[in-house]
UniProtKB/Swiss-Prot annotation:
SUPFAM superfamilies the UniProt entry points to: Thiamin diphosphate-binding fold (THDP-binding), TK C-terminal domain-like
Co-factor note (free text): Binds 1 Mg(2+) ion per subunit.
Name of the protein in question: 1-deoxy-D-xylulose-5-phosphate synthase
Binding-site list for Mg(2+): 152, 181
Keyword Ubl conjugation assigned: no
Protein keywords: Isoprene biosynthesis, Magnesium, Metal-binding, Thiamine biosynthesis, Thiamine pyrophosphate, Transferase
InterPro entries: Dxylulose-5-P_synthase, THDP-binding, Transketo_C/PFOR_II, Transketolase-like_Pyr-bd, Transketolase_BS, Transketolase_C, Transketolase_CS
UniProt binding sites for thiamine diphosphate: 80, 121-123, 153-154, 181, 288, 370
Gene Ontology CC: cytosol
Domain of life: Bacteria
Catalytic activity: D-glyceraldehyde 3-phosphate + pyruvate + H(+) = 1-deoxy-D-xylulose 5-phosphate + CO2
EC number, as in UniProt: 2.2.1.7
Length: 621
């Protein structure tokens, strides 16, 4: 997308933040209008995260106008909202490449720009990192300032409060900006969000802090702060002791779409010492009516026609694994009211929307709190219920201690439905599900299942749900199934693989949904093909039988080779003193960058041609 200067005359004058700061303050509202339109025009043509960025246009402009970035540090929590930041920091003409192979990274990324001071992607990390930078800046004593922008969803996570508690003790010069739009990805839940709603619907406090008076002095009354109430607030609202008890000087709420007021407030706050907290009210999807009306659907979008206001409908086709999981969940809950489903703020992505509506008493969205989700499930299991934790592979990393300490050691029957296992695609390094097999495999008594299609996925969910000997995990990918017919649910024999094809000399041991590619390769080279199904317990008898009958073995998985399922096969063969060549195929020892799933599989030789090529190169050594 080429930049049209005539269409965006003010934005054309601000291709860098240095140019932005040369603009007269009075031109900033026009700049914001053009920036918002440019974001709409570019994302509609290229796809990407959308509604979050629309909501922070004025805040982004104001922060870069006031703060001396990149000398001053500006941190965006999660990063979904950082497209305007990228546009203003020299990447305007490349914004159409975002989330594409070799394009701009979907999140702030240190290797991409000096303005991106922290790699992000997971939530609630900004205040901890920002505090560390602020303490370092204090020791440096050069006047460097640090500001963190965190959403009302991300701030509910425990890590954010741990950081604020420490910040209040350190007294470092740190600004935390709460971008409060009452929307994370799913609707926010929990007492903190309810508290903020109460603040906004209550009467203005008469007691104002002196610093607050100075910061807001000269500003017009706040307009249009209408959340869960039809009352208009005027002046400044102070939320009890919520943030001040943590040692912060609280200012706000202020209108996040009044760029001139934001500039005024931020200029005053930049001069204040110690931890500062600015509460900014914004509207997710601001300026584009369809996104304002339905910010969840417009959170991340494919290419679309802005004039129509409609997102393209997904082509009717094979069901996604997330949908298969959601259907199984509802089917099981209908027959068993002891089922309790737990998700850390990923209802839509995990396929749980229908379940949450049909079985509200068996559904728990614990917000962005993966650690709590897992230990909460442990408590449900102790109480005699049957918890199912629906969680993305990349987010399960955040609850590893709870998985071991609170679930596995106690051998509690908790089922983990691990979505987005393997290559996820455009969101890149922070979201690929490469490590789950490796970090789960070393946990004693953990059952790990890797379905090859949607029917096996259902059978494995059923198997794990009825397994009472300890925790179990079913790990399935992002994307659609293969069209396999769905059979009646039944428990699979624990730790048993299935031979799919008999061949000669070589056997391919497949773990997971690369089975179609493995089948194509097995046909081409006349290899035995096995659907191993279980990473743990491993079908040791079958592996040893295959080793005795073949000259070499190939293990195949869409996950980290180091510590993965193939490593389990290697360990068994070494322990049994079976000397046979083994090639482990999977993801290498590196973080996987953005791209489509097909592009990444091709690049890492995990499509059929690549697998066959890896085998041929190995045999030729």
């Amino acid at each position: 997308m080429s930049f049209e200067t005539a269409k965006y005359p003010t934005l054309a004058l601000a291709s860098t933040v240095q140019e932005l700061r040369l603009l007269p303050k009075e031109s900033l509202p026009t700049l914001c209008d053009e920036l918002r339109q440019y974001l709409l025009d570019s994302v509609s043509r290229s796809s990407g995260h959308f509604a979050s960025g629309l909501g922070v246009v004025e805040l982004t402009v104001a922060l870069h106008y006031v703060y001396n970035t990149p000398f001053d540090h500006l941190i965006w929590d999660v990063g979904h909202q950082a497209y305007p930041h990228k546009i203003l920091t020299g990447r305007r003409d490349r914004i159409g490449t975002i989330r594409q192979k070799n394009g701009l990274h979907p999140f702030p990324w240190r290797d991409e720009s000096e303005y991106d001071v922290l790699n992000v992607g997971h939530s609630s990390t900004s205040i901890s990192a920002g505090l560390g930078m602020a303490v370092a800046a204090g020791k440096e004593a050069q006047g460097r300032r640090t500001a963190c922008v965190i959403g009302d969803g991300a701030i509910t996570a425990g890590m954010a409060f741990e950081a604020m508690n420490h910040a209040g003790d350190c007294k470092a010069d740190l600004l935390v900006v709460l971008n409060d739009n009452e929307m994370s990805i799913s609707e926010n839940v929990g007492a903190l969000n309810n508290r903020l709603a109460q603040i906004l619907s209550g009467k203005t406090y008469s007691r104002l802090r002196e610093s607050g008076k100075k910061v807001l002095d000269g500003l017009p009354p706040i307009k249009e702060l209408v959340k869960r109430t039809e009352e208009h607030l005027k002046g400044m609202v102070v939320p009890g002791t919520l943030f001040e008890e943590l040692g912060f000087n609280y200012i706000g709420p202020v209108d996040g779409h009044d760029v001139l007021a934001l500039v005024h407030t931020l200029r005053n706050m930049r001069a204040l010492k110690g931890p500062q907290f600015l509460h900014v009210m914004t509207k997710k999807g601001k300026g584009y009516a369809p996104a304002e009306k339905d910010p969840i659907s417009w959170h991340a979008v494919p290419k679309f026609d802005p004039a129509s206001g409609l997102l393209p409908k997904s082509a009717e086709g094979l069901p996604s694994y997330s949908k298969i999981f959601g259907q199984w969940l509802s089917e099981t809950a209908a027959a068993d009211d002891r089922l309790m489903a737990v998700t850390p703020a990923m209802r839509e992505g995990s396929g749980m929307v229908s379940f949450s509506r049909d079985y509200p008493q068996q559904y728990f969205d614990v917000a962005i709190a993966e650690q709590h989700a897992v230990t909460f499930a442990a408590g449900l299991a102790i109480g005699g219920y049957k918890p199912v934790v629906a969680i993305y592979s990349t987010f399960l990393q955040r609850a590893y201690d709870q998985l071991i300490h609170d679930v596995a050691i106690q051998k509690l029957p908790v089922l983990f439905a691990i979505d987005r296992g393997g290559i996820v695609g455009a969101d890149g390094q922070t979201h690929q599900g490469a490590f789950d097999i490796a970090f789960l495999r070393c946990i004693p008594d953990m059952v790990i299942m890797t379905p090859s299609d949607e029917n096996e996925c259902r059978q494995m969910l059923y198997t794990g749900y009825h397994h009472q000997g300890g925790p179990s995990a079913v790990r399935y990918p992002r994307g659609n199934g293969t069209g396999a017919p769905l059979e009646a649910l039944a428990s699979l024999p624990l730790g048993k693989g299935v031979v799919k094809r008999r061949g000669e000399k070589m056997a391919i041991l497949n773990f997971g949904t690369l089975l179609p590619q493995a089948a194509e390769v097995a046909e081409a080279i006349n290899a035995t093909l096995v659907d191993m199904r279980f990473v743990k317990p491993l079908d040791e008898a079958l592996v040893l039988e295959l080793a005795a009958q073949h000259q070499s073995l190939i293990t195949l998985e869409e996950g980290s080779i180091k510590g993965g399922a193939g490593s389990g096969v290697n360990e068994l063969l070494m322990a049994k003193r079976r000397a046979i060549p083994v090639l482990n195929i999977g993801l290498p020892d590196e973080f996987i960058p953005p791209g489509t799933q097909d592009e990444i599989r091709s690049d890492y030789q995990l499509d059929a041609d690549g697998i066959q090529r890896q085998i041929a190169d190995w045999l030729a050594q």
